[in-house]
Structure formats: structure tokens, C-alpha cells
Amino acid sequence: MSRTPSAAPFWPYNLGQNLPGSFTARARGLFAPEFVLLGPGEEEFGRLRLGGIGDAQVRAEGFVAAFETSGRRYSMTADGREILTARPKGHSADELEIFCDGRTYKAQISPFRNLALASQLGGEKAACLSGSLTGRSYEALFAAKDRCALPMAIFLLWRIVATRRHAYRAGGAL
């Protein structure tokens, strides 16, 4: 019996309600080990802290979730439970399948263009992320009524930032 990740009990309900489908992320520090997450009126609602190559942590309204990489699988967990999981589609590093709340989403990421788009398999957009040329600020739009969309937007932010960081440390090779 397979267990499908669920965003419902672990993602703060008020957080999704207070963000009207968008947020901004800004790098804090010269080498951007941390991004401040800002809602309407530039109010901080959380932080994304990058760890090593395959891990990070997001803190928002007393909620803490961890991002982890295990082989070709990515996960976002809180209190030991999965909120969402993702894996590359086929051999592509730029296409992901994301699983959350019994649904499957497809995502396209372009780390060097600082863009990401996730949608349900039926085509309805769930999250869109676009960043500045330098990768120090990002704008995210997400479907406010889809409880997986906000964690997915933050997950996409992590994947783009972590991939760019890894590529630059490796001298431009992915």
C-alpha cells in the first residue's frame, strides 16, 4: 500500500490564507545561504535556509519543514511526515513529477533562467516562480485554493537555488 504525501495537516492553514496567491523571496547574505520569504506589504512570513548540496529547511509561522535529496528523489517533510515528494521525469533534470495529497503534478524548471512552472496533470497551473538575473530575488505565484501549491512553490524555489548553487560551485557543470 503506497502512502501519498499530504500537505493538509502539516502546512499552516493561516499561512496559505494570508498569502493571496503570491510571495517574494530575497537572498540574505552575500552568498545567499538564506532567503527571506515575504508576503503582502513586504511582511516576512518565513525563511528558507540552505544547508549542504541536498538539504535545506523552511521556517514559517512556527512551522519547520526540511527538504532532502536521496538519490534521484526529493522530499519535503515536517515532523517526520512527507508533505510532498518529487522525482525527475525520465532522465531529464529539468522535468519533475511532484506528488502531494494524492495528486500528481508536473513541473518544468530552468535554473539558469531562474524559472519554474508546476501544474496538475490536467493542465491547471499550481505554482510559477521567476527570479532575477542574479538569482537573489524571486517572485512566486501559486493557486491559493490548492493546498499543495504554496509548499510546491517553496519547493521549486529550493530546487532552483540549490541547483544554481551546485552548478556554480562545480564551475558551471551540472
Where are these regions (language model features)?
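Low-complexity or membrane-interfacial segments used for flexible interactions
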Residues: S2-F45, L50-D55, H91-L174
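Short, well-structured hydrophobic secondary-structure segments
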Residues: R47, G51-E82
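Beta-strand C-termini and the immediately following turn/loop, strongest in propeller blades
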Residues: E68, R87-P88, Q108-I109
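Helix-adjacent hinge/juxtasegments
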Residues: G71-C100
